[in-house]
Design a protein with these regions (language model features):
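Bacterial N-terminal signal peptides that target proteins for export
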Residues: 1-10
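Bacterial N-terminal signal peptides
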Residues: 9-18
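Sec/Tat signal peptide C-region and signal peptidase I cleavage site
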Residues: 19-25
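Thiol-based oxidoreductase modules, predominantly thioredoxin-like and allied folds used
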Residues: 28-29, 68-99
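A short beta-strand-turn-helix
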Residues: 28-46, 76
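Short pre-active-site segment immediately N-terminal to redox-active cysteine/selenocysteine motifs
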Residues: 43-46, 51-55, 112
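Conserved redox-active cysteine motifs that mediate thiol-disulfide chemistry
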Residues: 51-67
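Non-catalytic, surface beta->alpha helical segment in thiol-disulfide oxidoreductase systems
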Residues: 65-67, 103-150
Length: 150
C-alpha cells in the first residue's frame, strides 16, 4: 500500500512539475522555412532563439525566467513566430535540423548561447541580443514592442 501511494505521489509531482513546460514547446517551431511562411502570413516578427537547451546554464535560466513565463508566452502568441534553433549535446536531432541550425548560426554569426535574433516578417534583421537577458519578461517584451514602433 505504501509503495502504491508513493508511486501516485511521484506521478502527481511529475505532472505538477512538468505542467508549466508542456505548453511552452507547443508554440515553438524548429522548421525555419515554415516559421518564415507563418511570419509573412500573419505579419509577425520572427524570434530566433539560438540555444543549447540541454547543457547551457544561461539558456535554461533565460527559458525559465523569460521565455516560459505566461506574460511572454501570451505576447508571443499574438505578435511573434518563435523558433528554437537548438544545439544540444545529448538530445537527438535529425541531420536536416542540425544542418539547418548550423547554417542559420553561420548566417547570423552566432558565437555563444543564448542569442536572440528578431527578424521582420520579410526577413530583415531588427534586433540581436547575445547572452542572458536579466531584466525579466516585461522588459524583454518592452524591447520587442519598441521594434514594432520603429
Amino acid at each position: 500500500m505504501k509503495i502504491h501511494r508513493f508511486f501516485l505521489l511521484a506521478v502527481a509531482a511529475f505532472i505538477f512539475i512538468s505542467g508549466p513546460f508542456a505548453g511552452a514547446e507547443s508554440d515553438w517551431l524548429t522548421d525555419y522555412k515554415k516559421a518564415q511562411q507563418e511570419a509573412k502570413a500573419g505579419n509577425k516578427f520572427l524570434l530566433l532563439d539560438f540555444t543549447g537547451s540541454d547543457w547551457c546554464g544561461w539558456c535554461k535560466k533565460f527559458d525559465r525566467e523569460v521565455l516560459l513565463q505566461s506574460e511572454f508566452k501570451n505576447y508571443a502568441r499574438e505578435n511573434l513566430v518563435v523558433v528554437e534553433l537548438d544545439f544540444p549535446r545529448a538530445k537527438p536531432q535529425t541531420s536536416e535540423l542540425r544542418k539547418q541550425n548550423r547554417e542559420l548560426a553561420q548566417q547570423y554569426d552566432i558565437v555563444g548561447f543564448p542569442t536572440i535574433v528578431v527578424l521582420s516578417a520579410d526577413g530583415q534583421k531588427l534586433w540581436r541580443y547575445d547572452g542572458y537577458f536579466p531584466d525579466g519578461p516585461a522588459a524583454f517584451i518592452a524591447q520587442l514592442q519598441k521594434l514594432r514602433k520603429g
